[in-house]
């Protein structure tokens, strides 16, 4: 059973290595997702605010959205 905040390994060729289940899509009374359920993953962050400095390596890895939101890049 997969519940929110569970980290999962990606098994396709999308380029992602790991993702986290944020919410179970479907009926409001479902607490768990099961094997075979589809997980929607996007590269863009869910939030719109970044607090504090971030590492310079994120710019090299082309996370431009996060770099533009951060107040300082170290």
Curated annotation (Swiss-Prot):
Gene3D superfamilies: Ribosomal protein L14 (2.40.150.20)
SUPFAM superfamilies: Ribosomal protein L14
A GO molecular function held by the record: large ribosomal subunit rRNA binding
Listed transmembrane segments: none
UniProt entry tagged with the keyword Thylakoid: no
GO cellular component: chloroplast; cytosolic large ribosomal subunit
Lineage: superkingdom: Eukaryota
One GO biological process term: translation
Entry's localization field: Plastid, Chloroplast
Name of a matching Pfam family: Ribosomal_L14
Record keywords, A-Z: Chloroplast, Plastid, Ribonucleoprotein, Ribosomal protein, RNA-binding, rRNA-binding
CDD domains: Ribosomal_uL14 (cd00337)
Family annotation (PANTHER family): 50S/60S RIBOSOMAL PROTEIN L14/L23, LARGE RIBOSOMAL SUBUNIT PROTEIN UL14M
Family named by the database record: Belongs to the universal ribosomal protein uL14 family.
Function according to Swiss-Prot or TrEMBL: Binds to 23S rRNA.
Complexes and interactors: Part of the 50S ribosomal subunit.
Protein name according to UniProt: Large ribosomal subunit protein uL14c
Biological source species: Oenothera ammophila (Evening primerose)
Gene: rpl14
